[in-house]
Each structure stands twice: as structure tokens, then as C-alpha cells.
């Protein structure tokens, strides 16, 4: 999702000398393949957006997979970038790197000041390792590698898998299927009280290109909207946009995850960047994308 959004944005502003490989063409978890790609193609700038991602269910069930796969991807790409003279690299992390009970909104300085959320600890530790590797290379070797921490993302080419998706795409799929099947209720994990922030993925792509052009430094930069919504409020928004007429039921026996996740985006704002897509418009665009994927899958 993120990689395709960055490509769309780069092309829209006139870049056409892009080196692109799908996961089928290049397995980033295999060091030899990654090194061969970098030594042959010699890219000058790298956006490292590849990752194994998932929601609470997937992270809870497969923590070893999430840690191993993400560590391998990050270390292989960053290491190959250094050894092959990449001029600048942007590493995309996640807001889950911050402590579970960090002061809100979460500033970049909150990193490693407390315990992580248990349900996605493995993924968070992998992401922290990636940003720290960039930091250490900058300090030791004089590289220009920057780390960007986006909030929760959604938009075109999202993952709508019933077990492995994040909350917003999962809600889109669940309400759509309930509408199509005329089901009386839709069940949602937890209490609905956790607060979350959401950023449309094309806005993140715009921010990444802005930072690649305008920021150099060893400090992490948060990317978000600075606005939050409860899971309960989000569910109602998605329900209305999808057009589902039934009821919402909350399964309080299931985990909520982190109670609140709002990023402090003051550093990015001071650099001169602002998001453009509000949540309602973004969910409408995401639902249109979901429908187009569903139609293609049926053909």
C-alpha cells in the first residue's frame, strides 16, 4: 500500500527513473538477492516501505514471524544501501514503537521511555531496530538515512484480509459483507473506547517525498494528522459510508490494544508540511478502492 502510494506521488511530480520490484520478483528477506539487486541497479535514493504488517489478531498469533520477517527486510536493505553507496534512504517505521502509556500526543522523544504494547511488541521491536540501525550508520559512517514514523494508515491497495488487516480496512470489509448478507449485527473486538489517529496513505507518500527533499537528521519524524477518533466513532463512520443498517456489538472479552495513540506532529508541521485528506473523505475513497478490488476479484 505505502510503496504504491509513493510511486504514484513520485510519478505525479515528474519522476520516471524509478527502480521497482514486486515481492515476487525480489525477496527482501534474502540477503543475497538484495545485495545482488543493489550492486547491479545502483539506486541513489531508497524509500524503505516494505514490511510484514497486520492487526491485533495476527500480531498476537504470529509474533516470531513479525519480528523475523521485518528484521530481515530492514537489515538486508539498509545494509545493502550502505555497501552500495546509496545517497539517501528513508526508513518507514510505525507509531507502535512508542510506549503503551506514553504521554499524549506522543513526541519523538518518547521512544524507549517505557514498556511497549504487548499485542504488537514483536513488530515494534523490529521497527525500533531498523530506525536505530539507520541512526548508528549515520553516526558511525556519515550516511544520510532518515526515519519516519507514520500513524495508522489506510487507503488504496490496503489489506482487507479478515485476520491480517488493520482496524479500518477490517471494518470496511466487515460492514460491507454484513450489508451484502443482510446481517442484523456486526461484532467488533474490545470496548470501542481506544482512541486512534488515521492518515490517508497518499498524504503519507507526499510527506515522505517532502522529507526526502527537505530533511536531514538523526531524529525520527512523526507523520500524522494530529487528530484522533475513538474506535466506536470510527465504526459508526464506516457503517454510514458503507450503508449498513444493522447494529454494532462490542466483544469486551477481546483486547483493546493501546488505549490511546496520537502523534505529536509539531516537528513536521514546523518543517512546513500538512496533511490534505480528512477522515470522512479518505474512508469514502478507501471504500471505493475496496469495491473496485472486490469487483476485479469476482471476474
Regions found by a protein language model. Give the residues of each.
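C-terminal substrate-binding subdomain of Rossmann-fold SDR/epimerase-dehydratase oxidoreductases
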Residues: 5-13, 177-299
Amino acid at each position: 500500500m505505502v510503496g504504491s502510494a509513493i510511486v504514484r506521488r513520485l510519478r505525479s511530480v515528474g519522476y520516471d527513473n524509478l527502480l521497482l520490484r514486486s515481492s515476487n520478483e525480489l525477496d527482501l528477506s534474502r540477503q543475497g538477492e538484495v545485495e545482488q539487486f543493489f550492486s547491479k541497479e545502483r539506486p541513489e535514493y531508497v524509500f524503505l516501505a516494505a514490511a510484514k504488517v497486520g492487526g491485533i489478531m495476527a500480531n498476537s498469533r504470529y509474533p516470531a514471524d513479525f519480528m523475523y520477517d521485518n528484521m530481515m527486510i530492514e537489515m538486508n536493505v539498509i545494509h545493502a544501501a550502505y555497501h552500495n553507496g546509496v545517497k539517501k534512504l528513508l526508513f518507514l517505521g510505525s507509531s507502535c514503537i512508542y510506549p503503551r502509556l506514553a504521554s499524549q500526543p506522543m513526541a519523538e522523544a518518547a521512544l524507549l521511555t517505557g514498556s511497549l504494547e504487548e499485542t504488537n511488541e514483536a513488530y515494534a521491536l523490529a521497527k525500533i531496530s531498523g530506525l536505530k540501525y539507520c541512526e548508528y550508520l549515520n553516526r558511525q559512517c556519515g550516511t544520510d538515512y532518515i526515519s519516519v514514523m507514520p500513524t495508522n494508515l489506510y487507503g488504496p491497495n490496503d489489506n482487507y484480509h479478515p485476520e491480517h488487516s488493520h482496524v479500518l480496512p477490517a471494518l470496511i470489509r466487515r460492514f460491507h459483507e454484513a450489508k451484502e448478507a443482510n446481517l442484523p449485527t456486526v461484532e467488533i473486538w474490545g470496548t470501542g473506547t481506544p482512541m486512534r489517529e488515521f492518515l490517508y496513505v497518499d498524504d503519507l507518500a507526499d510527506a515522505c517525498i517532502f522529507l526526502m527533499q527537505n530533511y536531514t537528521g538523526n531524529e525520527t519524524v512523526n507523520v500524522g494528522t494530529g487528530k484522533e477518533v475513538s474506535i466506536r466513532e470510527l465504526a459508526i463512520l464506516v457503517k454510514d459510508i458503507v450503508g449498513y443498517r444493522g447494529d454494532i456489538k462490542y466483544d469486551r472479552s477481546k483486547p483493546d490494544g493501546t488505549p490511546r495513540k496520537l502523534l505529536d506532529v509539531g516537528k513536521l508541521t514546523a518543517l512546513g508540511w500538512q496533511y490534505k485528506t480528512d477522515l470522512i473523505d479518505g474512508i469514502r475513497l478507501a471504500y471505493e478502492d475496496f469495491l473496485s478490488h472486490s469487483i476485479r476479484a469476482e471476474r
